[in-house]
C-alpha cells in the first residue's frame, strides 16, 4: 500500500550500466533527486544496474571505469536516500555473468544491502493507493529484465506482448533493449461474481537506459537507444505511460 496519494508515479530504472564508459551519472543523480523530492514518486529496478565487465564477457574490461566490486559499492551507496521508495528489484544479464562464472548473485547482494524485495527472474507487484473514503485503487504490475535483441520496434513489441502469456496484469514492464516502447491491448476476463465477461486493458512498456551512445552498441552498428526513462502514472484505476 503506497498511501493516500490520489495518483502514483513509478520510474522503471534499468540498464544503468555503472562502470561502462558511457554511463550517464548526471542522469542518475537527477533521478535520485527527483524521487527524493516527490512524495508519490517511486522506483522499480529491472537489472543491469552495473556493467560488470569480465574477461569471459562481451564487455571490454580494459575500458571499464570501475572494477565490478567498485560498481557494487557504488550502487548500494548511491540510492540510499531513496531506498525506502524502491519497491523491488530483478536481476539483469550483466549481473548474471558473475552468477554463471562464480555462483554469486550480485543482484541479490545489492538488494540485500538496499533491503528491498528481490527475485532473479521477475517480480509481480500489487500496487494500492488512495483514501479509504474514495476506495483504494489496485493494479497488478509484472516486471522482468528481458532478453534477446530485436532491432525493429515491431520485434521489440512482440517480445513485450509475450509477457502476457505468463500472467494476467494491468502493466507489463521490461528493460534490456534500451528503448522506450509502449502500447496496449485488451482481453476479456471472467467476472464470476456477476456472471459476466469484462474487458480488461493491458499496457506494455520497455524502458530506456542510463547509457550514452558508443562502445559496444556503436561497434555492433546498433542504432542509438532511449537515454532516459518513462514515467508510469497510476490514477483512478488507470495506467498511463509518460514518455
PLM ranges: what are they?
Residues 1-10, 125-142, 199-202:
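Beta-strand-turn-beta hairpins that frame and shape the catalytic cleft
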Residues 3-120:
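Core catalytic region of metal-dependent phosphoesterases/phosphodiesterases
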Residues 14-17, 129-131, 145-148, 208:
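Short, flexible loop/turn elements at secondary-structure junctions
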Residues 35-38, 129-135, 188-197:
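Alpha-helix termini
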Residues 88, 93-104, 226-243:
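Charge-rich, low-complexity terminal tails
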Residues 105-106, 112-114, 136, 140-143, ...:
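Extended, solvent-exposed, turn-rich assembly/linker loops in the middle of proteins
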Residues 117, 126-136, 161-166, 196:
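Short, conserved, surface-exposed binding loops centered on an aromatic residue
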Amino acid at each position: 500500500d503506497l498511501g493516500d496519494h490520489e495518483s502514483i508515479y513509478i520510474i522503471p530504472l534499468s540498464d544503468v550500466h555503472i562502470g561502462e564508459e558511457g554511463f550517464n551519472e548526471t542522469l542518475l543523480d537527477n533521478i535520485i533527486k527527483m524521487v527524493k523530492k516527490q512524495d508519490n514518486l517511486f522506483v522499480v529496478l529491472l537489472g543491469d544496474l552495473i556493467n560488470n565487465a569480465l574477461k569471459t564477457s562481451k564487455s571490454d574490461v580494459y575500458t571499464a571505469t570501475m572494477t565490478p566490486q567498485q560498481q557494487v559499492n557504488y550502487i548500494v551507496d548511491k540510492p540510499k536516500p531513496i531506498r525506502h521508495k524502491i519497491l523491488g528489484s530483478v536481476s539483469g544479464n550483466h549481473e548474471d555473468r558473475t552468477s554463471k562464472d562464480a555462483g554469486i548473485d550480485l543482484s541479490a547482494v545489492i538488494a540485500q544491502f538496499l533491503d528491498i524485495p528481490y527475485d532473479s527472474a521477475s517480480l509481480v507487484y500489487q500496487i494500492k493507493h488512495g483514501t479509504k473514503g474514495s476506495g483504494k485503487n489496485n493494479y497488478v504490475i509484472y516486471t522482468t529484465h528481458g532478453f534477446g535483441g530485436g532491432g525493429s520496434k515491431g520485434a521489440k513489441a512482440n517480445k513485450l506482448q509475450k509477457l502476457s502469456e505468463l500472467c494476467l496484469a494491468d502493466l507489463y514492464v521490461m528493460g534490456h533493449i534500451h528503448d522506450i516502447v509502449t502500447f496496449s491491448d485488451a482481453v476479456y476476463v471472467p467476472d464470476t461474481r456477476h456472471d459476466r465477461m469484462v474487458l480488461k486493458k493491458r499496457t506494455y512498456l520497455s524502458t530506456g537506459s542510463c547509457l550514452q551512445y558508443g562502445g559496444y552498441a556503436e561497434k555492433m552498428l546498433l542504432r542509438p537507444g532511449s537515454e532516459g526513462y518513462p514515467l508510469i502514472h497510476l490514477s483512478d484505476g488507470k495506467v498511463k505511460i509518460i514518455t
